[in-house]
């Protein structure tokens, strides 16, 4: 009888009344732009107003260097990471630095967008394709088009030695295109230039210094919307992608709040925020931003983060040998 009465009383409680109210502090280390990071934090605070979140924003290599220094000092400060690429996350997982979130709801997400053991989770798909100036002699539709005589000396791209996205792109293309590294040998033979970051590529192609550029999608798409003479294509063979994964550090002092942050980022509402910010959301049911084709028209090539981590030094050496860097 007492059990029945208790069950009845529980049923009358408002939803969430039995759940522990989250509070305390969280520190997020992120490579997101400041505005994007704050909007993500605001989404958490809308549901959990007693959680106080601060963030440190920098490029992924500098974030990692900061973490390394803190690990060595025995004083890690971050609870959460939201950075550019899964290869970095895979390295931290291998070192035992990440806390798995076994309760994360990833039912809607395809394989490859998260760690199978739930240590990290993709939040976006930032693909790399081909931008071209509207004065270019032809509209590229294939990666092979950058090897055409008409493109000789007119191709620019970030170097995998300096850009994480470019390193993932190289690993993806050489792992999927027939001939592997012969494609990069062909680019070098066609006088392609490798150096700088994606911002430099955008400036070069939009300004007409080079007619073709290998670049992340959102930069030229946004620049075109502002009136710049630039177009972007998703090559027919497929594209590489970095996924801006989120993860919880094992040293967190507030694991439940950290898990709530991950849950919100992975939720449909959190993924729609990525859409509003102008990115391709990792959630397959979320629409794409203005200026993009349909999701079905974009083929994302397979990518193995663990293999890319194991091959990182070899891939950098191979690229440097080809391009003399």
State the predicted function of each range.
Residues 87-91, 211-229, 278:
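A ligand-binding cleft/hinge motif common to bilobed small-molecule-binding domains
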Residues 98-105, 119-122, 144, 212, ...:
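Short beta-strand->loop
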Residues 240, 249-303:
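Mature extracytoplasmic/periplasmic domains
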Residues 180, 282-325:
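An extracytoplasmic/periplasmic, membrane-proximal ligand-sensing/linker region
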Residues 13-19:
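Sec/Tat signal peptide C-region and signal peptidase I cleavage site
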Residues 111, 126-127, 185-187, 194-195, ...:
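Periplasmic-binding protein-like
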Residues 23, 27, 31-38, 58-61, ...:
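Extracytoplasmic ligand-binding site segments that recognize negatively charged/polar headgroups
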Residues 39-55:
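Short alpha-helix C-terminal cap/hinge motif
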């Amino acid at each position: 009888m007492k059990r029945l009465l208790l069950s009845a009383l529980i049923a009358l409680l408002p939803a969430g009344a039995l759940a522990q109210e989250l509070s305390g502090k969280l520190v997020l280390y992120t490579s997101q732009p400041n505005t994007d990071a704050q909007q993500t934090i605001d989404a958490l605070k809308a549901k959990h107003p007693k959680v106080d979140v601060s963030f440190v924003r920098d490029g992924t290599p500098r974030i990692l260097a900061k973490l390394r220094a803190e690990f060595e000092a025995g004083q890690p400060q971050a609870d959460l990471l939201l950075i550019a690429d899964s290869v970095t996350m895979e390295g931290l997982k291998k070192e035992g630095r990440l806390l798995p979130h076994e309760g994360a709801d990833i039912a809607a997400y395809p394989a490859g967008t998260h760690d199978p053991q739930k240590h990290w989770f993709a939040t976006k798909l930032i693909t790399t394709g081909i931008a071209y100036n509207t004065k270019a002699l032809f509209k590229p539709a294939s990666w092979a088009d950058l090897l055409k005589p008409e493109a000789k000396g007119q191709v620019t791209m970030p170097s995998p030695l300096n850009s994480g996205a470019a390193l993932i792109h190289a690993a993806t293309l050489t792992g999927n295109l027939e001939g592997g590294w012969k494609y990069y040998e062909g680019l070098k033979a066609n006088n392609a230039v490798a150096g700088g970051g994606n911002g430099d590529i955008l400036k070069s192609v939009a300004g007409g210094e080079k007619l073709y550029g290998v670049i992340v999608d959102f930069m030229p798409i946004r620049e075109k919307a502002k009136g710049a003479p630039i177009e972007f294509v998703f090559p027919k063979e497929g594209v590489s992608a970095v996924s801006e994964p989120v993860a919880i550090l094992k040293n967190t002092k507030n694991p439940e709040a950290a898990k709530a942050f991950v849950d919100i980022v992975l939720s449909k509402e959190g993924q729609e925020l990525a859409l509003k910010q102008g990115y391709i959301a990792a959630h397959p049911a979320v629409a794409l931003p203005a200026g993009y084709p349909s999701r079905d028209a974009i083929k994302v090539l397979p990518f193995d983060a663990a293999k890319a981590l194991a091959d990182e030094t070899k891939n950098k050496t191979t690229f440097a040998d080809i391009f003399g860097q």
